[in-house]
Amino acid sequence: MNHKRIALNYFYFSMWTGLSGAALATMIRLEMAYPGSPFFKGDSIKYLQVATAHGLIMVFFVVVPIFFGGFANFLIPYHVGSKDVAFPRLNSIGFWIQPLGFLLVAKIAFLRTTSWKYYDKTSFFLQPYNKSLYRDFFNFLTGELSFNPFKKSLDESLFLFLWKPRKKITNTEYTSFFFNPLNLSFLDSFFYYSDNLWSLANKVVSSRRKKIYVTKCSNRAAVTAGWTFITPFSSNMKYSGFGAQDVLSVAVVLAGISTTISLLTLITRRTLVAPGLRNRRVLIPFITISLLLTLRLLAIVTPILGAAVLMSLMDRHWQTSFFDFAYGGDPILFQHLFWFFGHPEVYILIIPSFGVANIVLPFYTMRRMSSKHHMIWAVYVMAYMGFVVWGHHMYLVGLDHRSRNIYSTITIMICLPATIKLVNWTLTLANAAIHVDLVFLFFCSYVFFFLTGGFTGMWLSHVGLNISVHDTFYVVAHFHLMLAGAAMMGAFTGLYYYYNTFFDVQYSKIFGFLHLVYYSAGIWTTFFPMFFLGFSGLPRRIHDFPAFFLGWHGLASCGHFLTLAGVCFFFFGIFDSTSENKSSILANFGIPKIAKRAHLYFFKISYNNYTNEIASELPKVEVRKFIIENTFGEYECVKLVPVTK
C-alpha cells in the first residue's frame, strides 16, 4: 500500500501495456504497408478490432497510468508534505482494477470473426453433431430459410437426454468453447445443443420461435463503433452484436472506476499539505500544480463518460431509448457526452508534460522560470477552456453554423495560453548557461512535437478545413503527434529526470540517446507523411488504399519500425542500468548543479551558494532507503553547509 510501490507498479504496468499497444500498431502498419490487405487478408472486421483495441489501450492504459499513477503517486505526497496519500488501501485497489480493464480490451483484438450465429439478443455457438446435419445446416445458410437445422434432433426426441457421442467434423471451421472432462453425453448435449429444450417447449406450447440470423462475418465480434463508441453502432445490437462491444464497454467502465478511485486519494491534498502551503501555489513545484489541476479535470469528466457508456449498455440490453431516434432518443447526444469527456481528456494527457518541462528547464538553464505566475494561469485557462470546445469534433454531424462559429472561435483562443507557455520557455532559455544533457534533449524534442501538433490542431479549428480533412489521415497525424509525440516525450523527459529517484540507479546515457534519436525520428517519419495523405483525401478507418499512395504509406511503415527500435533501446537501457546496478548519488536526487550564486526556494527553505564542488562531494547513498526511512518533514533536518571561500 506504500504510494511509492504503487507508483512503480503503475510504471511497470504502463510499460507492458505500451508494448501490447505497439504490437497492435505494428499489425496496423503491416496491413497498410502495401495495398491489397497483405496482413489481414481482406478481413475488415479484424482490422477494426485491432485499431479499436490499439486506441483504447494507448489512451486509457498507457498515458493515463504513467502520469496519474506513476508521477502523481510518487511525487505529490512529497511535494505537499504528506507521508502518503489520503487512502492508501483504496489507492492499491484502484491500481489492481486497471489490469482487468486492460485484459478485456486486449481480448478484442484476438476475437474470431468467422462463422458466428446471432440469435436475437442471446448468442451461442452452433455445433452440428454429424455430417448430414452439417449438410442440412449448409443448405439452411445458402437459402432454404424455412428449414429448421434442429428438426432431426427433435425427431430423435428419445435421445433428448442420452445423445450419441459427438463425432468430430473434419474440413470445417467450427471450434468448441466448452470442455467436458468426463465426456458425459448429457453435458455434451446440454452445451452444444442448448436449443433442444427450447425447441421442445415451443413444440408443446405452439409458440412462435425466435428468428435466427447466421452470417459468415457476424456482428458478434464486430466493433464497428470504434474507440469513440459512436452511436447507433454501439447502442444497437443490429450493428454490433452481443459480445465485443459489451466487453469494450465494461472495460472502459472499469478504467473509469480505477481512475476515479485513484484521483480521490490524491485530490484530497488540501487536507494533507504542510502548514503554510495550502493556498500558496508558488511554493509548490509546477509538476505538482499541473497534476493536481488535471486530477480535478478527471474528477469532472470521468463520470460523464461512465454515464454515457452505461446508457449505451441500457439501450442494448434493457430496451431503453436514450440514443434510439425511432423511439424519441438522440444518437447525437452520445457524441456530445463522449466529446465533453474526450476533449478535456486531451488536455489531461498533455498538461502534466507542461509541469515536467517547467521542472526540467530551470535545472538545465541554471536560472528561474520566467514568469511562473503567468505559466500557472496559462495552464488553468487552457484546462478550463477545454470544457467549452468539444463541438469542434462534431462539425460533420449537422451542427448549425452559429454553433460551429462559436466552437471555432474558442478553439482558436486556446492558442493564446499555449503561446504564453512557449514564449516563457524561450525567455528562460535566452542568455542562460545551458547544460546540454540527455534530459534537456528530450525536452527540446518535446517542444518540437508540441509545436507541430498544436499548429495542426489550430488549423483543424477552421470549419471549412475540418470538414474537408476530418475523416482523413490528417487527423490521425495530428493526434498521434500530440500523444505519441508530445505527451510521451514529456513522460520520457520526466522519467529520465527522476530516474534515480524512481529506480535508485543511474540511467544508461548511451541507450538513452539511442532511444531519443530512434523514437523521435520514427514518430516524425511515421506520422508526418500522413499529413500529405490527408490533404490528398485518403480516408482513415479503411484497411486498404489505392496503389497511388504506396509511397507515403510505405514510408510511414518504415518509420514505425524506427519507433519500435527506439522503444527497444528504452528497455535495453532499463536492463543495462539495473543489471550493472549503477549507484545514484544524492546530487541527482534534486539538488541542482549550479556553478554560480543562486537562491532555490523549496518550501520556505533557502539553500544558498551550492556549487558543483559541494554536489560532487556528497556521499553516495541508497536513495530508495533514504526515501522510505525519512518522511518529508524530516527533510528540513538535512542541512548541507556551503563551502566558504
Curated annotation (Swiss-Prot):
CDD domains membership: Heme_Cu_Oxidase_I
Binding site for Mg(2+): 470-471
Superkingdom in the source lineage: Eukaryota
Enzyme class, broadest EC rank: translocase
Binding site for Fe(II)-heme a: 54, 480
Binding site residues for O2: 347
Transmembrane segments: 8-28, 56-76, 90-110, 247-267, 282-302, 337-357, 376-396, 410-430, 438-458, 475-495, 513-533, 555-575
InterPro entries attached to this UniProt entry: Cyt_c_oxase-like_su1_dom (IPR023616), Cyt_c_oxase-like_su1_sf (IPR036927), Cyt_C_Oxase_1 (IPR000883), Cyt_c_Oxase_su1_BS (IPR023615)
Membrane topology: Multi-pass membrane protein
Keyword GTP-binding: no
Descriptive protein name: Cytochrome c oxidase subunit 1
Provenance organism: Paramecium tetraurelia
Source lineage: Eukaryota, Sar, Alveolata, Ciliophora, Intramacronucleata
